[in-house]
Amino acid sequence: TATDPVIERWWSHEAPRRRSAIAELREAAGEVLVTTPNYSLFRDVPRWDDLHAMKRIAIAWWEFVDGGVPAALHLNARTERDYERWAHFVSNRPEVTHVAFEFGTSAGRPGRREWHAAQLAAFARATGRHLHLVVRGGIAVLDVLASAFARVTLLDTTAFMKTVMRRRL
């Protein structure tokens, strides 16, 4: 199965060490909102690999919230059924007030971007709640997202990418 080497380190620590790291973050950062890790879903791996990644996202979200750090649940999905699962999960957890999504990678491709925006809008309706969406990229579908969520915070990827590529804004 596929791995996300950069964020796999989180799981190399036992739960007590993860709780300690979250407590350190809470003390050092003060009032913040974090987004949970975006464990990738891949098309070329067994389906249960995706479901395992979604489970890890939910566990990481809970560990932050349980540790007193406000967290946006990252919605990573490949199928309509994945979005339905997330809607069911969120509907049963009133402590979920913020969700996150990123259009910076394959979800931001033309065609796929619009599909994800429509799925996110359907997700928001299915939860029956006023959720705040934190979204990275996706300015082209911002109107769809803004009409579906109570609030949207857009994190622009342009400045970051130009910095990485050492280009002027």
Tell where the protein language model's regions lie, with residue ranges.
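C-terminal accessory extensions appended to soluble enzyme cores
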Residues: 139, 144-169
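Active-site-adjacent beta->alpha loops and helix N-cap segments on the catalytic face
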Residues: 45, 49-58, 108-121, 140-143
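Distinct, well-ordered alpha-helical segments
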Residues: 80-91, 110-123, 144-147
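Structural preference for beta-strand elements that scaffold enzyme active sites
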Residues: 32-35, 68-74, 96-100, 130-134, ...
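Surface-exposed cleft-lining segments at the edges of enzyme active sites
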Residues: 3-11, 39-51, 70-77, 104-110
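Short loop/turn segments at strand-loop or loop-helix junctions that form parts
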Residues: 1-6, 30-43, 99-105, 155-159
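Acidic (Asp/Glu)-rich catalytic clusters
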Residues: 19-32, 60-66, 89-95
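Non-catalytic, usually N-terminal nucleic-acid engagement modules in DNA/RNA processing proteins
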Residues: 1-24
